[in-house]
UniProtKB/Swiss-Prot annotation:
Pfam families: Mur_ligase, Mur_ligase_C, Mur_ligase_M
InterPro entries linked to this entry: Mur-like_cat_sf, Mur_ligase_C, Mur_ligase_C_dom_sf, Mur_ligase_cen, Mur_ligase_N, MurCDEF_pg_biosynth, UDP-N-AcMur_Ala_ligase_MurC
A single GO cellular-component term on record: cytoplasm
Pathway: Cell wall biogenesis; peptidoglycan biosynthesis
Keyword Flavoprotein: no
The name this protein goes by in its record: UDP-N-acetylmuramate--L-alanine ligase
GO biological process: cell division; cell wall organization; peptidoglycan biosynthetic process; regulation of cell shape
pH dependence: Optimum pH is 8.6.
Gene: murC
Amino acid sequence: MNTQQLAKLRSIVPEMRRVRHIHFVGIGGAGMGGIAEVLANEGYQISGSDLAPNPVTQQLMNLGATIYFNHRPENVRDASVVVVSSAISADNPEIVAAHEARIPVIRRAEMLAELMRFRHGIAIAGTHGKTTTTAMVSSIYAEAGLDPTFVNGGLVKAAGVHARLGHGRYLIAEADESDASFLHLQPMVAIVTNIEADHMDTYQGDFENLKQTFINFLHNLPFYGRAVMCVDDPVIRELLPRVGRQTTTYGFSEDADVRVEDYQQIGPQGHFTLLRQDKEPMRVTLNAPGRHNALNAAAAVAVATEEGIDDEAILRALESFQGTGRRFDFLGEFPLEPVNGKSGTAMLVDDYGHHPTEVDATIKAARAGWPDKNLVMLFQPHRFTRTRDLYDDFANVLTQVDTLLMLEVYPAGEAPIPGADSRSLCRTIRGRGKIDPILVPDPARVAEMLAPVLTGNDLILVQGAGNIGKIARSLAEIKLKPQTPEEEQHD
C-alpha cells in the first residue's frame, strides 16, 4: 500500500496509539494469519511464530513479516503487543516473556475487534457455514464496488488469500464461538447460521450456556444494528424472542423474511428463487452445491439487500462464486488404471467438514449433484472428545456413503479416550449392516487401499479437519495412483 492509499485509510481508521510492532504467537493459523495480513497491509511491523511453515506463513513473509519457526522468549523482543490464538497455552515461553516485560497479551478476537472498531462491521457466526458465508458476503460487497476488508477462517479462492485490506468502510469477518472470544466483537450486522452443541468444553458442557453466549454476542450490536438469523434452525427459532435487536430471518421455512424455494442442484451449481419482502423474486444461480449453501447465500443476500446493494451485483457475485479452500473443493477428475478389468474416472473432492451435520450436508450435496456416482469417503475424525460426544451421530451419517475408509482420529493435542477411536467407530458402523468400513492404519497407504474399491465412476470425498487436507492434495498430485517404492523414493 502506497503513502497516499495509507493516508486515505487513516482518514477512516485511526492508527492504534503507540503500537508499531505486533507479534502473533501461532501465526500460521488461518484466523491469526488473516488478521496479521490486514495489519501488515496497514503498515504495522509484523512478526510471529509457529512450529512449521505453511502457505499462510509464506504469504506473510512475502508481505515483509518476520516469522520464527520456534517459540522462544527473544521472539517477542521490542513487540508493542502480543496476539495469541486459543490453541496456545499460558506457559508458552513467548507469553511468559511478554508478561515479564509488561507487554500487553491479547487474544485474536480482541485484535479483530480493534480492526472493526472504526469500520462498519459485519460478523458471521454459527456452528456451521461461517467461512463460506463470510466469503459470499465479501464477494457480493466486492462485486458492488464497495472494496471491503475481510478476515476469513478459510481461503477465499477468488482472492487467493484468507484476508484482504480494502479501502472501503466495511469489515466482514468470521466470528469464532469455539472459545467464546467473539464476545469481543461489536459489529453493526451479525449473521448466525445455526447453533449446535460443539466446543462444549468452552461452555462447561452446558448447552444453555452456549445459547446464552450467542444471545450476548447479538446484544453487542447497537440498537440500530441488525441480526440476520436462519429460522430453519430449531435453536435459533427458540432464541428469536430473546433477541432484543432488529432481526431478519432467512431459510426454507414459509415464515422466513428471505425465503429459499424451488431449489434444484445440477452438478456443482444450485438453482433457486429467493423471496424477499417488498422485492421482486430473485432467481439465483449459485456456483456452490448443496441446500446448505443456498442457506448461506440467503444470509449473504439478506445482508446485501439491507445495505441497498443492487440485485445485479448480488447475482453476478453468486453465479461466479469460487468458494473457499477445503469446502467441497474440487481437486480434479482422474483416469483410473484398470483394476480387475475396471477402468474409468474418479472425481476427487476435499472438504473440511468434521461435525456430523457438516458431513451429512456434504454427502447430500454429492448425492444431489452426481446421483449416479459411486460415493467413496475417506474420513478422519477430529478430536477424541468430539468423536465421543457425537459418536452415534457420526455412525449414522457415515453409513450414507457407498464405501468408507477411515483414518485414525486426529487428536489436535488431546489424549486418547477409550471407545472414541476410529477402530471402535468402524466396528459400530459395521454392526449396523449397511457398509463395511475399512480402517486405514497408515496415511501412507491411502492410495493403495483406495484403488481396489474404485469402480471407474466414482466421487471421492476426502473429509475432515486434521491433516487430511494434505492427504487430499497428495492424492491429486499422484492422480490417485498407488506409488511403488521406487516412485516414492524418487519423489
